[in-house]
Amino acid sequence: MSTRKLNMLTPEPIHLLEEGGDNSEEFVVDEGCQVQRIYVGDGSITTSDEAKFTIWKVTTELIVHKVEPVRVSIPLEIVSYRRYSEFDQLRAEIISKIGKNVQVPELPPKVYWYDYWRFSKINLNRHWLNKRRQGLDNFINKIIKNKDIMESCAKEVNEFLGVSSDVSTRTNSE
């Protein structure tokens, strides 16, 4: 029987601001739903079968607009948990779908195989983990703010964030 150990990092959300622009812009997920904010925080270090890795908490704050019977905006928060490799997979899916025509944001550096022997030390270093969290936060926010990427890959990004296309329908029926 394997034991699991979790260590929590304190969340330190960052906000991506576009240079010279109005940062109050909302990004449409579907007709009745807009992303207010996305942030990566709360990295949990987990041990399973002698392998250590970090799972990142990705929080998507949405505003769902309901028109009938009365116009109202409902805040909604969706939380998903992702490993670095899942961010990497999302980036690869975006690149394969849109090609090299659009510049896809970079991810923070990987731990390469020749450094793997040091991985457990790196993976427990709070400074290194905070830098990685900031890089992942920066990556996902740049993806969301890139209209070319979102026009082509909204389905993939929404699935990654745990946002389904019927989120406003689910909320309206509650």
Curated annotation (Swiss-Prot):
Keywords: Endosome, Membrane, Vacuole. It is found in: Endosome membrane; Vacuole membrane. Belongs to the YPT35 family. One of its GO terms (molecular function) is protein-macromolecule adaptor activity. The PX domain binds phosphatidylinositol 3-phosphate (PtdIns(3)P) which is necessary for peripheral membrane localization. Pfam families: PX (PF00787). Coiled coil: none annotated. GO terms for biological process: protein localization to endosome; protein localization to membrane. This is Endosomal/vacuolar adapter protein YPT35. SUPFAM superfamilies: PX domain. It is a peripheral membrane protein. Recruits the lipid transfer protein VPS13 to endosomal and vacuolar membranes. It comes from the Eukaryota. GO terms for cellular component: endosome membrane; nucleus-vacuole junction; vacuolar membrane. Residues 34-168 form the PX domain.
